[in-house]
From Swiss-Prot:
The lineage of its organism: Eukaryota, Fungi, Dikarya, Ascomycota, Saccharomycotina. Homodimer. It comes from Saccharomyces cerevisiae (strain ATCC 204508 / S288c). It holds the Pfam family GTP_cyclohydroI. This is GTP cyclohydrolase 1. Residues 18-55 are annotated as: Disordered.
Amino acid sequence: MHNIQLVQEIERHETPLNIRPTSPYTLNPPVERDGFSWPSVGTRQRAEETEEEEKERIQRISGAIKTILTELGEDVNREGLLDTPQRYAKAMLYFTKGYQTNIMDDVIKNAVFEEDHDEMVIVRDIEIYSLCEHHLVPFFGKVHIGYIPNKKVIGLSKLARLAEMYARRLQVQERLTKQIAMALSDILKPLGVAVVMEASHMCMVSRGIQKTGSSTVTSCMLGGFRAHKTREEFLTLLGRRSI
């Protein structure tokens, strides 16, 4: 009965953003089956490169970092910086390892199950770390993911892994929030998906306006969660009155 009422509420409600004919998310889907979103040639190459090609990539990045350090006025031959270019290159590849992750083969695998559960499933307080694509400095915080099953559920740890995959790329928080929501929607075809993210951005804390106490909240509501009552229930369960 709950699902019937929810479907009726969805039908009465405005068409969800991701299926509007004129929506940019319909014309240019932000989530492909391999997990990329508007991928460049370089991300494809990186995902498919051999171990030897990865070593060559590390050397190229190291060379670029040496140039940057030199232009900053540093001596790249002093003891403290001798191995820094190599370490930084490996660190950056780790921070952006999501470019090498396949959403179905590496993240979801066989963790989608038939189940007749028809109430919200919520995983709260998933910690995420990412890099702002504008300044290449970190932003970090927590993401809360909820969905209403439609005969299928997913292993709970996979929600955290899904968030991790998209976070380990050069990102903006708004896009990261949408990618998580739409990927889950694509995989499960649920009655609704809700994602709320709260993060602190080092580009606001350590430079520019330097507001150390600020945080940014973004959300993406799909399907049934675009209806006010369902959204309100989700936010109440998160301990929030609004977003």
